[in-house]
A protein has these predicted regions:
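Long, low-complexity, Lys/Arg-enriched
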Residues: 1-135, 143-377
Length: 377
């Protein structure tokens, strides 16, 4: 089976500046830059670096404002959001700035339900909304996972539906594992569901006899996420399932995967009864390699289980946003049988705000190039 993004273009932090200078060297480019409004101190890193290297760029900036509800713990960080917005206003003229607001939760009806992923798919409604842009950059550094999965999926679908047009689609992310550790999710959602547009037909009645294989990509301090995900995977007592934890290796900290195994030893091997041979490893700092490794594992499972009419695949990313890009690409390429199960939160807590801000300049910027010039035959 040929993989869509193999070969691929991936730009690390050291190559960023020269790459943008070379790519936007002529004046024919028209760029749509999408980012999230939030308290994450990395919100403007990608945009600032791009404009430093390409100051004359023809750019429109679309900022996604997401409302987590009146009870969200994130409201206490409004002062950081204000600082981020002040920085953004120094980078972009107001006439080049578009704002789109979406609600994370739907309060209509008796129960509060997550709606951010569905609402995110409407930020860009139709192909004519992007037709004029030669380049689109989505910076996911300060966007919630459910938001950028749906947004990226929608843009890929729109671009793929117009194959005779050429749009360069990039994802950027300012990666910093230490900052990620300082941001703790709170008020985790109890009623888990697969992300909008990434259901993988897993819950269709006609598909429920197929075994379900779950690939949770692990990061630090995600005990509750893993338990909730496992409860969802095993809720149908008549359905066969298997769990294949994915650990980050190689990684910037070479002992990180060992530390994660120690942290989750009881949960994985005693509570979930996982066989050691089911554990996978994939590169912490290369989302395309994660995409390839996951794709190959999925292919092997489907071939092995073809005799009983195949299987369904669920992927969850409890790790970095950089790694999550790999799972996004796997799910998009295999939408009929791979679903994304996300554990949503009602807000966030910063464990050490001073340290949080100090770490900003230690972040590394990565670029994944998904569609456009390199992929045209």
């Amino acid at each position: 089976m040929d993989l869509r993004w193999s070969p691929h273009i991936f730009i690390d932090d050291k190559a960023n500046d020269e790459f943008w200078k070379e790519h936007f060297d002529n004046k024919s480019h028209k760029l749509l830059f999408i980012l999230g409004k939030g308290f994450d101190i990395r919100m403007n890193i990608a945009l600032a670096r791009l404009l430093y290297n390409c100051p004359k760029l023809n750019i429109t900036c679309l900022i996604v404002e997401f409302d987590e509800g009146t009870n969200s713990s994130s409201h206490k960080y409004q002062h950081i959001i204000d600082e981020n917005m002040a920085e953004l206003n120094q980078l972009i003229n107001v006439e080049n700035l578009i704002s789109k607001k979406i609600n994370i939760w739907n309060d209509s009806g008796r129960e509060k339900r997550i709606a951010g992923d569905k609402n995110a798919s409407r930020i860009i409604k139709k192909y004519s909304d992007i037709k004029e842009y030669t380049d689109i950059i989505i910076d996911i550094s300060s966007l919630p996972r459910g938001i950028y999965f749906s947004l990226v999926g929608k843009l890929l679908a729109l671009i793929d539906s117009n194959p005779h047009q050429n749009h360069n689609l990039f994802l950027t992310v300012a990666e910093n594992v230490e900052i990620d550790r300082l941001i703790q999710e709170s008020a985790l959602e109890d009623d888990l569901a697969y992300l909008h547009g990434f259901g993988g037909e897993i819950e269709l009645e006609s598909e429920k006899e197929k075994p379900l294989i779950w690939f949770p990509i692990l990061g630090e301090e995600k005990q509750f996420h893993i338990r909730k995900g496992a409860d969802k995977i095993t809720e149908d007592k008549n359905r066969l399932y298997e769990i294949c934890p994915v650990l980050p290796f190689p990684s910037k900290n070479p002992r990180r995967s060992d530390s994660l195994l120690i942290e989750y030893h009881e949960l994985l091997f005693d509570f979930l009864d996982i066989e050691p041979q089911n554990i996978m490893y994939t590169s912490e700092r290369d989302p395309f390699q994660a995409y390839i490794d996951l794709s190959n594992a999925i292919i092997n499972y489907r071939q092995s289980l073809d005799i009983i009419n195949g299987c369904k695949i669920a992927v969850s990313t409890f790790s970095s946003k950089l790694l999550s890009i790999g799972s996004l690409l796997v799910a998009y390429e295999n939408r009929s049988f791979v679903g994304i199960m996300n554990v949503n939160s009602g807000g966030y807590e910063i464990l050490d705000e001073d340290r949080f801000k100090e770490l900003k300049n230690q972040s590394e910027l990565f670029v994944t190039w998904l569609t456009g010039n390199p992929y045209k035959e």
